[in-house]
Every structure is written in C-alpha cells, then in structure tokens.
Amino acid sequence: MRSGVIARKVGMTRVFTDAGEHVPVTVLQIDQCQVVAHRTTEKDGYVALQVGVGKAKVKNVSQAERGRFAVAKVEPKKKLAEFRVSEDALIPVGAEITADHFIPGQFVDVTGTSTGKGFAGGMKRWNFGGLRATHGVSISHRSIGSTGGRQDPGKTFKNKKMPGHLGVERVTTQNLKVVRTDPERGLILVEGAVPGVAGGWIQVRDSVKRKLPADVPLPGKFRENGSAGASQVEAAPEAPASEENA
C-alpha cells in the first residue's frame, strides 16, 4: 500500500486521444509535496506517512509545528495529511513526491471538500419530489410536506431530511482514471470531475477497489535532497572528456 499525495485543484479542461475523441479531465497540481514525518508501529501503533504541501508563512505556524518541520529539515507547510502505507512503502523524510508517482491508466481515489451551496431546500438537498403542480397546491410546490406522524409518534424524529446547509463536506470520488502526468510542472490529469472548488486541496491515493498495475513505482517516485530518489531512473553517465590537442 503506497502513499498518496496532496494536490491543488486547478480546474477542468479536455485532452484528445489518438482516435480523436476528447476526454474531460480535471487538472491537479502538486506543489512541493514532501514527507514530513513517519508513523511507525513501535512508536505509534500503525505505519503511515505524514506529508505536507504548499508554503506557509513562519508567523502563521505554531512553535511546536516549527520544531517538527525543523526536525524534518523542510520548510513550513500549509497543508498536512497522513496516508497509511505498508512498511515497504515508506519514503524518506524530506523527500519530495513527484507527479509521476502515478502512471497513466491507473485508477485513483480523490478526496476533497465539496462546493458550498448555502441554504438549500429539500428538493435540491435530498432530491425530494415536491408537491403537485395543480389540484389545490399553491405556493408550496417545492415544500417537503409533512415531517411527522399523527398522535403517534406525535413528533419529528431526529436526523429527518429537511432543508438546511448544503455542501462544504468531505467527499471521496472513487475510481477516477489517470489520463496523463507532467512531472516537470507537477500536473496530474484525471478523467472526470473532482469534488471541490478550483484552488481547493485534494488528496489523491491509489484506488482501493481496483487492482494496482504491476509497473507502478514502489515505494514511489520522489526526489531526495534535491536529487533523484531510489525509485527514479538513474542519471545518464557523463561523457568522457575530450583529449587536448598536442
């Protein structure tokens, strides 16, 4: 089980396949997603990675958090999240996870905060059918109708679906296909819509319901201390120096 990443939702666009068909995609951007800490079985009772993304102002970071970032030797991060991983998928602290951590064709689960829609009625919030258009109904066409019984039970139960605030909830969309990645610009293009507004934080992880492709990098693609990580492609050997003229 590999680590996920934190990305920022840029927006939607479309890309074209070799057959000329257009595919709607959501563009996600990774901005210096670094490993901040490890969670181990001996110390914490479980195995996980804490990753951070974005750059936070030092004045907005508490003294305790500054100490944690100093131990990890990373700059203060704006957004933190933990991802459960297996012991063989631990990435070194301070390493930066790149966009090619995911490969085209694999499926991912994305988690974000849904767009806020304010106070909504029962028809929009819960897909109620509303009342009739005619036959004595006036003004109340979109009302929810009765909310309780008669003398028994004589009350409206808790958690009854009623009008109220809609949106701003944690939403996970499963099995989105990775269409393309751009490691140089830190972009991940996934097919379809992703919850949340443009500029919102999105957690991206391997799909839990789809089989992981055999060629995905393990423990992942990352840069360690400004150089390529263990799973990255090794650098090409240097060309031999030319001989000087006599």
From Swiss-Prot:
Keyword Zinc among record annotations: no
Name of the protein this chain belongs to: Large ribosomal subunit protein uL3
Annotated keywords: Methylation, Ribonucleoprotein, Ribosomal protein, RNA-binding, rRNA-binding
Biological processes annotated in GO: translation
Record note on modification: Methylated by PrmB.
Family, per entry: Belongs to the universal ribosomal protein uL3 family.
Purpose: One of the primary rRNA binding proteins, it binds directly near the 3'-end of the 23S rRNA, where it nucleates assembly of the 50S subunit.
Region called Disordered, residue ranges: 140-162, 215-246
Stretches that traverse the bilayer: none
Bias type Low complexity, positions: 234-246
Known partners and oligomeric status: Part of the 50S ribosomal subunit. Forms a cluster with proteins L14 and L19.
GO molecular function per UniProt: rRNA binding; structural constituent of ribosome
PTM sites of type N5-methylglutamine: 151
Pfam (any one): Ribosomal_L3
GO cellular component, one term: cytosolic large ribosomal subunit
Keyword Ribosomal protein tagged: yes
Region forming the signal peptide: none
